[in-house]
Amino acid sequence: MRRIFFILTTLIIVSCNTNKPTQTAATIDGNRITATFNDTTKLFFILTDNNELQLIWDNSENKRYNSQQRLHYHGELNIPSTVMLDNKSYRVTSIGDYALYQQRELEKVIIPDGVTYIGEKAFSGCDHIIEINIPQSVTSLGEEALSRCKRISEIKLPNELVTIGAYCFRNCVSLHTLSMGEKLETVPQGALFGCASLTEVHFPKQLKSIGGEAFSNCLSLRSITLPSQIDSLSNALFASCESLEDVTLPANLETLPADIFNHCSSLKKINLPTTLKKIDEWAFEGCTSLSTIDFNDGLEIIAEGAFAGCASLKQITLPASIKSVGSLAFGVSGKIKEVTILGNKAFEIGVRSALPQKPAKIYVPRGSIDQFQFKPLWKEYFLVERK
């Protein structure tokens, strides 16, 4: 006969036992199971089609999170590896979406080996968690699975991990070290957005891509070496990393995407790959310490605002390969005093201050000034032939 249970809709505080959980009761309603451990700790599970268990946030069928209709845990929570029901053992293999969302009194969570999936926002907003283990069996982390866990300082991802959801560790502000598993091929969008204490990242050798904003607002990140096999990057990847000083870019990049180093105010110099063809919009905007930039021969496009607000730049040289420079590419600060153009033909420029304006001097090859001064938009600049 099916056992029926009811959920109290008032707030219940559960003190979690720090020892290995001993099951003392279990009831089932349809495919939803309530199990009690050490006589005090209640956990809720759903029985999947594979006869395995997924930890869920409550035992109702209401899929919307409701903080008043759930148990609240504090201290240490030891998630069991199995649950006994009617003399049959069921394995716990996943932690569902929102399972422990905003459990603000939890300090430590022990996840059993055998769990393969941790769902969307499963631990998001667990402000007081200091320690959480991610077992080697885990192959997938959902979107924002551990976002806003503000006290976790170090995470070692398992070698079997294949997938990380977007913004997985967003605003884990105490996280200073992250080691990624060797099978991980993609760091998704916003994965470490706002991890203000992050100083060190270890990438797997076979990493293929990194999503936009993945390290944006990592205020303590000083140095980063991107894996050489990556051939494209995403927008705002390191935006507002105000301590970033040293960057090693992959050798085969053709484009630096929009906002990639936007407001990296400590960046003084960067070596661009020889394969680079385009620097996109606002890529280095607000890099106030950037004092030198060597453009590679082969660079074709410097887009709008790419170096706007780079107040320490005093001189630039544009290679003969340049085909287009967008509006406000070097801003309007007046700090750049001279520009040297190596090509002998005018290239396309934006309608608004694509190059530094007078009194800055724009040096062009000897005998080529007519190729520039009679072209549209070039008349406003102080053109000088090199000797």
Where are these regions (language model features)?
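Sec-dependent signal peptide recognition
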Residues: 2-7
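C-terminal motif of bacterial Sec signal peptides marking the signal peptidase cleavage site
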Residues: 13-15
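Bacterial signal peptide processing site
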Residues: 17-19
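N-terminal low-complexity, Pro/Thr/Ser-rich intrinsically disordered segments
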Residues: 21-44
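Structural signature of tandem-repeat unit edges
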Residues: 50, 72-94, 104-117, 127-140, ...
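A short, structured beta-strand/loop element
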Residues: 50-78
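Consensus positions within tandem repeat domains that build extended binding/scaffold surfaces
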Residues: 96-99, 119-122, 142-145, 165-168, ...
